[in-house]
Amino acid sequence: MKAKGIYFVDVALLLVAVATCLTGVFLHKAGHFNTHEVWHNWAVAHIVSSVLMLLFGALHIYAHLGWYKSLLKGKTKGKSIITLMLSVLFVVVTMTGVVMLAMTFVPNTGVGLWHYVFGLALSVASIAHIVLRWQQLLKLKSAIR
């Protein structure tokens, strides 16, 4: 993937990650304090933003496939632990989200709480990942001008 494509994917992923995080928090809150209709609206918004996050997340991983290959060869360094944690959390949150969608006929399972807790952890790891790589994103932006 060329620099312009990587930059577009990274910015899009950042935007949908924020949307996914916010809709997830509002969805959780709506489950405690609002009507089913309000909860349902937040659920739809969260699912749409999550599907977009999955799409742009997959493109982001594809663009940085070299990092995963070097990880398997034991040649990563520095900021790798945050990226590894982020990757694992992304998989866990995605899996618990899919399980919850498959279990819509079973209300009040513990999976929802796990999804929420791991989602918050994913948000923290994402912020750390973005902060550690912010300068790289800015360099990429200036390189495509």
Regions found by a protein language model. Name each.
Residues 1-145:
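Membrane-embedded alpha-helical bundles that constitute the cytochrome b-like, heme-associated redox core
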